[in-house]
Amino acid sequence: MQATVPWLSLSILVPIVGALLVPLVPDKGEGKQVRWYALIVTLITFLITVAAYLTGYDPSLSGLQLSERVSWLPDLGLTWAVGADGLSMPLILLTSFITSLACLAAWPVSFKPRLFYFLLLAMDGGQIAVFAVQDMLLFFLAWELELIPVYLLLAIWGGKKRQYAATKFILYTAGSSLFILLAALAMGFFGGGTPSFEYTALAAKDFGTGFQLLCYAGLLIAFGVKLPIVPLHTWLPDAHGEATAPVHMLLAGILLKMGGYALLRFNCELLPAAHSQFAPLLIVLGVVNIIYAALTSFAQRNLKRKIAYSSISHMGFVLIGVGSFSALGTSGAMLQMISHGLIGASLFFLVGATYDRTHTLQLDEMGGIGQKMRIMFALWTVCALASLALPGMSGFVSELMVFAGFATDEAYTLPFRVVICGLAAVGVILTPIYLLSMLREIFFGKEKEELVSHTNLVDAEPREVYIIGCLLVPIIGIGLYPKLMTDSYRSSIEALVSRNLGAMEQVISPTAPLIRGQAPVPAIIQAPAVGAS
């Protein structure tokens, strides 16, 4: 469906052009005018994405909508192609929403404010482009464009070990991005037909199973770094350990979701035959994420690193949902990305706000501040309950959908489903233990004399309450009425799962020796029942 108004191009170009105009904003060096300018640009971008959803997006359709296509370099198959479907539209809205709140969270930044907001706006445009472009080379360019601002935001405004964290981030993410470029070139020039990198053209190509497996493996590494998947995760705790609050919000709220989105868009949608072979591995990796990261989070004494490992654990549910051949499970993975984006952004913002008051991240140095910071304690409590998947919150719905979808997924054998659900439940049990224990150590117990005498323990200010309130509205809204979000992508998810089931039935037919365990594909997969989804 062609767009009558170029909403998506505007949502990409407005923050990028806004970033380029930052040097022209009059300012006396304190950053006040630049702050307001950046906030206005991010709000305009958010309103553009909302207008795109309300005026040009039909949730009942599974195909591409709001599409724009302009030939760029036709001899090389390069095209400016953008569009949105159920996989991308919710994440575009999430990106513009969280970025506008991150801009407000950056209000106290006074060191090099022009450069800071320039990078923030450039990052906004790059991240929206990742979800909106419909050309694999454009996707690679947007993926790389987003890396540079993150690196500089870490290296310049980070903590004591900011150079180490920023360097590790760029080495992991930029190095793994090479696999995206190689896969894009291979898929664009092979498979028959004229060279093209548009998703629709790539989906129509006839790639052999061996070719798909090779591309899938490379893309899994690239996207696994960003998700992140254990053991490709070690950059994330270091990056979160040194980042400032607004950068935290962008890392947890948006950056990790790029990996989950890319798995659905490329590995599942464009390489369905390979996905039927790799899906069990995704399930196992998801369980490893959930349990390993939960146990590691439980042992952390640094507040930022504790929440960072909690994020890794929660993203394990995304892997299980992506690996399932159930519309319910895959829909749960999508909802988990959105839910974690909101909850992760809120928790990391509160970490930054608490550090501004206590000047420490060590739980051993905290305690007894609940009496002096009652509103802050209330905000922490609600966000922690959302993170541990309390009923009535978005996290409960998304995790329940993943569990129910995988448990009823007849594409996998019953023993495998029982084992995976049992192991994943261990992570669900560990989460409230380490989160509630964290709250107790921060706010309860005896006041630390050194903490009270050397810090200004003022309660939450209106700006902070407003930011958390804006994040809690969709968290609670989705928790009470999930259709508010799931209807926006249901049709696209059902079409994706149907395609993957069809590809799996071609690879694993009901009469194939796989069921007897003789085929070179995972014996934990069985042929789905007719009509299973």
Curated annotation (Swiss-Prot):
UniProt entry keywords in alphabetical sequence: Membrane, NAD, NADP, Plastoquinone, Quinone, Thylakoid, Translocase, Transmembrane, Transmembrane helix
EC number: 7.1.1.-
Subcellular location: Cellular thylakoid membrane
Ranges annotated as spanning the membrane: 5-25, 36-56, 70-90, 91-111, 115-135, 137-157, 169-189, 210-230, 244-264, 278-298, 315-335, 336-356, 377-397, 418-438, 465-485
Keyword Kinase: no
GO process annotations (BP): ATP synthesis coupled electron transport; electron transport coupled proton transport
Reactions the enzyme catalyzes: a plastoquinone + NADH + (n+1) H(+)(in) = a plastoquinol + NAD(+) + n H(+)(out); a plastoquinone + NADPH + (n+1) H(+)(in) = a plastoquinol + NADP(+) + n H(+)(out)
Pfam family, one: Proton_antipo_M
Location, primary (coarse class): membrane
Entry keyword annotation includes Electron transport: no
Annotated HAMAP family: NDH1_NuoM
Stated name of the protein: NAD(P)H-quinone oxidoreductase chain 4
Organism: Synechococcus sp. (strain CC9605)
Gene that produces this protein: ndhD
